[in-house]
Amino acid sequence: MPEGNERVLITGVLGQDGWYLARQLAAAGHEVHGTDRHESRVAAGDEGLQGVALHHADLLDEHAMGRLVAEVEPTRIFNLAGSTSVARSWSHPAESANILGVGAVRLLAAAWELHAAGKAVRFLQASSAEIFGDPASSPQTEDTPIAPVTPYGAAKAFAHSMVRVYRQRGMFATTAVLYNHESPRRPQSFVAAKIARGVAEIAAGRREKLTLGNIDVSRDWGFAPDYAAAMNVILDAPRADDYVVATGDSRSVRDFVAAAFRAVSIEDWESRVEVDRDLFRPADPRSLVGDAARLRALGWKPSLDFEALVRILVEAQVAAVASEG
């Protein structure tokens, strides 16, 4: 991406992906605007986002979002807003559909107004591997059938399809089909962060056991800053398209647990982990792994392998536990 010549709008800028993306774009000299739906968080600001203009805006409010897009006139829009929790989508399915699905359409419509007025604008939707449901073939590509099995996946699938509609209409509209991606900023409601924290506490003698759900499901685990960089690459591509963002390396939760304990020099981990079937999620795909060949052809590649990723997450939690005294 050429340095310093874009006006960027990122929805969900205070989330994991939005935070890393905003920092990367601001460091490159771009004018960066970001939204969050919680007015108190916008007012409080974020020390890590110096130079980023924060706005209170909600994808549920079509008129307010439309006004913001018209005022900022972004040349690039990244829609990263909304909960990324599959588990939460089961308890709040209508809200998930409204924010993740219809909310994306509200933003697409606002972007279309800029496009229709002759203004250059490129749009990226943060899609998800959950749109593929429990796929029959691996690895998945951009052509894998869309067949979601969760409310989260269904909402993301609708947004994904609407991006294609606006692309066919003539707008530069893209999707980044994101597989699991982690960082020290990931909330502990997600399994990778939960494991990293639990292992750090066990290593420090703070607890004896780590309780998890199904540890035999497999996922393609990546590093969030790499995936933020991938979104930059996608919007800088010569043509709009859909792009799988993945490492191509499928590892089970069991593998993740073992690697996390290795990071604190504990090999005999089985006795320290309990599996609770009450924590199993309904309709959880057994295996998801992506083929990012289309994205790699643009020059992108992940910077970390699986072991290095897990080590970074665990070391961050070891430091956090130590700082708590």
Residue ranges and their predicted role:
Residues 9-26:
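N-terminal Rossmann NAD(P)H-binding glycine-rich loop of SDR-like oxidoreductase domains
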Residues 11, 35, 77-81, 123-129, ...:
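SDR active-site strand-loop-helix element
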Residues 21, 27, 35, 64, ...:
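C-terminal substrate-binding subdomain of Rossmann-fold SDR/epimerase-dehydratase oxidoreductases
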Residues 30-41:
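Conserved glycine-rich Rossmann-like NAD(P)H-binding loop of the short-chain dehydrogenase/reductase
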Residues 49-61:
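Rossmann-fold cofactor-recognition segment
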Residues 59-99:
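NAD(P)H-binding glycine-rich loop region in Rossmannoid oxidoreductase-like domains
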Residues 62, 104-108, 231:
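Conserved internal alpha-helix within the Rossmann fold of NAD(P)-dependent oxidoreductases
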Residues 91-109, 118-125, 130-175, 182-186:
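Catalytic helix-loop patch of NAD(P)-dependent Rossmann-fold dehydrogenases
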